[in-house]
Structures are given as C-alpha cells and as structure tokens.
Amino acid sequence: RDAGFAAFRAERAGPDLNTRVADVQRSLSSFDVILWQEKLTGRKFDPAIEIVLLQFSKPHGIKVQGQTFLQATDYDVATTVRIAAHEMLHPPVPMDGPVALAALKVLDREDLIMRIVREHDPRWGYTTLEGVLNEDLCEALDQLISEALGVARNPADRWRKQDDGMHVLAAGLYGLLR
C-alpha cells in the first residue's frame, strides 16, 4: 500500500482492461482450436478454454492447469490462438505410455538429439529427452493447427530462430506429419 501499487496497477492496466477482455472473447469465437487438437491427437478436450490476461508475462504463454493458460494482455489474436493451440497439448501423448517410451528409446540413440538435450542453453528449459520430445511434438502439432486456422508463423523461421534453433525434432516431426 505504501509503495503505491494500487495506483501503479490502475495506471498500467488502464481503464480499458474489461474492454480488452471482451474483445479477446469476441475475437476468439471464430477459432476452433479444440476441433483441431482432437483431430490431431485423438483425445477429447473440454469445450472451454480459460485465458488469464496478465500485465507482466511476456514473452511467454504459460499453461497453468488443464485448459487454463496465462498470456500478456496486449497479445494479438493470432498469438493468442497459437498459445492456445500449443499449451493445451501438453503432454501431446501420455509420456509414460508405449508410444512415448518407444520414441524415447529411439531418440536416446540419436547423437544429434542427445547433443541438443545436453548442450542447449538451459534457460529454454527442456533439460531432459522426455521434455524435448514433449515440447517438440507439441510444437509440430501446434504448427499444423495454426496453419489450419490461418494464424501460423513461417515454420522454417520459427524453428531456426526460436530458442537458439534447438527444436530440430519439432521441425522433423512437422515434416513427417504434414
């Protein structure tokens, strides 16, 4: 209170926060992310997605639990759709199931993939082979969803620039799934 946080927050959020929430809801109504997630994963998803708009979350969209994720208040609609397409996929398959275990067994023998796991900048996360598989499969699937919904980034640019280019597996999986 003494630091003036309430006034700072009111100034930072501005008078238009409720308007922004309504704009986001209205803008997203024409994007059926869940339809594509169900189609590509074979899983059922709840029909509702909860987006929590925050002032200080850039540059990330962050899954909290279930189908709730956090994102910056001022992200555009395309970014919001891409975040929803990605975050709700975690994990893309049961990571202790036969498909993931078989993939992990194969990937564990791949020198390039294991070098990426060991040597990439740890600030990007994904410090285990399981983490890389989980993330990169989500990225490949979210790219397909974003393309279907008309909000995709260029995949070559995305994977060359993002996280110092560590998502080689995502690019390969995307190529196989297209």
Predicted ranges, named:
Residues 81-99:
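Active-site recognition of the HExxH zinc-binding catalytic motif
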Residues 119-178:
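Long, well-structured alpha-helical subdomains associated
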Residues 8-64:
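Auxiliary, metal-adjacent structural segments of Zn-dependent hydrolase domains
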